[in-house]
Amino acid sequence: MTRCAGLVVLLVSLVSTCTATSAIAQNVNLASDKDGRIRTQLNPRNAVTLSSEIAARIASLPLREGDAFRAGQQIVGFDCALYQSQLRKAEAATEAANAVLQSDQRMAELNSIGKFEVEQAQARLKEAQAEAASARLLVGRCGIAAPFAGRVAKRHVAAHQYVTPGNPLLDIVETGQLELQMIVPSKWLAWLRPGAGFSVDVEELGKSYPAKVQRVGAQIDPVSQTVAVFGVVDGNQPGLLPGMSGWAVFPTRK
């Protein structure tokens, strides 16, 4: 009875393995068609969720979803009246501490006070300078500049809304040269190299664009025997958008 049960378990295991292998092979085949074309997708080179670094009310949020922006352009502004007031107070305290130190140093030269008093004045000045630096840092975070040229993918907040540190504000994507990502059979590495040319048929536009392989993935999937390949479309193609998909056609595979 035990031997029969063992055989049943073995058969079930073999069937499960074959089923899993068949599913993997089917998934790999879905990525290509009978003509050897490979499924590919356009991805932004950079996609970032901008978050708040301070607690403040949003004073300026000029961009809406789909709007374009330049690198370095301020795309979020905060009401920082409180932080600016704290900075002015810290700078005034620094000036006062510096004046006390200079006075104590002159008095020490006349032997009116000792070295300890001068050292205390120096410590108070350093503390005031640190407070001013901290306040200056907060004021510097009262606006968010775009790290690259791109477009707004999603707005998480609205103007005049109060946010705290860590709150997501905007999802932005770079709209320069988009990156093509695809999964190809690992045996293609026998001839596929960075710089190899191919064309990509974009389904959403019904157009074909020249492209080239930029880099090959660092490892092969041992189960599916596939590897990731990344490419770029030649030239500036403003009609292309992140998320578009299509087919990569390699001349040697026609």
Question: Residue ranges of each PLM-predicted region?
Answer:
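Extracytoplasmic
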Residues: D35-R37, N43-R45, E53, R64, ...
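Alpha-helical coiled-coil segments
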Residues: L82-L137, R155, L180, S224, ...
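Surface-exposed patches in structured soluble domains
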Residues: Q41, A59-P62, A68-Q74, A145-W188, ...
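N-terminal beta-strand block that forms a small beta-sandwich/beta-barrel module immediately after a flexible targeting
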Residues: T21-A55, Q214-R215
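Low-complexity, intrinsically disordered
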Residues: T175, P194-P210, P238
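Structural microfeature recognizing short secondary-structure transition sites
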Residues: A153-R155, S208-K254
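Short, surface-exposed secondary-structure boundary micro-motifs
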Residues: Q74, C80-A81, V118, P168, ...
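Bacterial N-terminal signal peptides
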Residues: G6-T19
